[in-house]
């Protein structure tokens, strides 16, 4: 969304967004109560490797270095614990991502992510933005219980921002309806060649 329909996403950006989405759902369904011992050990190893390139800390003793790394892990854990996801919506994802993306970039020393542009482009779909209803409408109450739905997309077929989003929403509604086994489902795409 933030790159537009003609933009390309780098592998780093793709992995970053995948991580944020995975963590977002994990926090909603399971919460985050802190790192497990294997996760702490993995972080410790990563931070130790990153620390080897830190010339400022070259004269630091091993115990001071270990203590500093443990404090850094505790700080990362504290920031993660503060992130709560109460409801699943684009608003809550936006709030989560705006805090988590800079943290992930800092923790992994990723310098080439332009999260200012990401934030600016996504804000249109956030609370109060021009398209805030597009991704924040409660599908369970508005579309999910309907027996017959018509999506008229002629007016947005040339919109590079809305057309891909509406297409994804249509597919999501259809896939969710497919999971209900009590009735027949039909997806009719009329004049598909125009879209």
PLM segments and residue spans:
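P-loop NTPase motor domains
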Residues: 1-195
């Amino acid at each position: 969304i933030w790159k537009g329909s003609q933009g390309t996403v780098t592998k780093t950006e793709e992995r970053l967004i995948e991580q944020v989405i995975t963590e977002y759902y994990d926090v909603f369904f399971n919460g985050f109560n802190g790192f497990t011992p294997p996760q702490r050990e993995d972080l410790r190893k990563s931070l130790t490797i990153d620390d080897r390139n830190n010339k400022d800390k070259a004269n630091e003793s091993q115990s001071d270095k270990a203590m500093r790394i443990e404090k850094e892990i505790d700080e990362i854990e504290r920031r993660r614990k503060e992130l709560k996801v109460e409801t699943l919506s684009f608003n809550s994802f936006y709030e989560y991502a705006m805090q988590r993306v800079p943290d992930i970039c800092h923790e992994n020393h990723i310098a080439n992510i332009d999260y200012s542009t990401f934030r600016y482009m996504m804000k249109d779909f956030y609370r109060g933005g021009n398209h805030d209803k597009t991704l924040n409408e409660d599908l369970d109450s508005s579309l999910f219980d309907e027996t017959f739905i018509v999506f008229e997309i002629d007016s947005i077929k040339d919109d590079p921002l809305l057309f891909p989003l509406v297409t994804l929403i249509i597919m999501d509604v259809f896939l969710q309806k497919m999971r209900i086994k009590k009735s027949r489902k039909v997806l009719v795409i009329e004049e598909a060649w125009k879209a």
